[in-house]
Regions:
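Substrate-binding cleft/loops of secretory-pathway carbohydrate-active enzymes
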Residues: 147-177
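Short, glycine/charged-enriched secondary-structure capping and boundary segments
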Residues: 116-117, 161-163, 183
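Feature activates predominantly on carbohydrate-active enzymes
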Residues: 1-142, 147, 167-171, 193-204
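Generic local-structure boundary detector
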Residues: 85, 111-113, 155-159, 177-181
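Alpha-helical scaffolding within the catalytic cores
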Residues: 149-159, 182-194
Length: 204
């Protein structure tokens, strides 16, 4: 909790003033070189609920005894095949784009089926299933970059190293940005160090 008089300082993603952006050495584009329609939180774009949920609930997250269209089941081989095909189609549609996001949707209802849970336990984090899944996608597109999120339940680093063409977008949304992260966001700082041991491709 913040004490009275304290404020959280949030970085701006978009810079309306080009002079200010130049001074700060920040691009005015929030996602340069990305496929325009696949920049972040993309799972629902690859497997839309309205297209797949009724006929293939097994493609989606198991929570308790229910399949929910909140996230994907990342150990289902058919899900992997569909995502690979979707990524290929988008790169064909936007040949100048160099990066696409293959990333969780904006909720914490990730799959807890036996297969996904086993991997997450082995990896020490739910990022385990994510990185293994994203690596499988990235292996098909060696000349492109596949971005994914280290966010909420996937922020803690796993054991599997991302491939060289995988970009980790590490999110500091929970942090108080009015002070150095080592002072007021130690968990994030530790996660940053952990991911840094696995890859040099980190975007914050």
């Amino acid at each position: 909790m913040f004490e009275k008089g304290e404020e959280t300082v949030h970085s701006r993603l978009f810079y309306d003033n080009p002079d200010y952006a130049e001074q700060q050495k920040v691009t005015q584009e929030s996602f340069p070189t990305y496929v325009p329609s696949a920049r972040v939180h993309t799972f629902h774009k690859f497997l839309p609920e309205e297209k797949f949920y009724k006929s293939h609930p097994e493609y989606f997250a198991l929570r308790g005894d229910q399949r929910l269209p909140t996230q994907l089941c990342l150990t289902n081989p058919e899900v992997l095949a569909i995502v690979k095909d979707s990524v290929a189609s988008l790169f064909e549609q936007y040949p100048q784009s160099k990066v696409i996001s293959v990333s969780q949707d904006d909720n914490q209802q990730h799959c807890q089926c036996d297969n996904c849970s086993k991997i997450d336990e082995e990896e020490g984090s739910a990022s385990g299933t994510m990185i293994r899944f994203v690596n499988e996608v990235a292996a098909n597109f060696p000349d492109k970059m596949i971005s994914t999120l280290a966010y909420q339940y996937t922020r803690k680093p796993c054991k599997t190293k991302p491939l060289e063409n995988v970009l980790i977008t590490l999110t500091s949304i929970e942090c108080d940005r009015s002070a150095p992260i080592a002072e007021k966001c130690a968990d994030f700082a530790n996660d940053l160090v952990g991911w840094g041991k696995l890859t040099q491709n980190i975007r914050i």
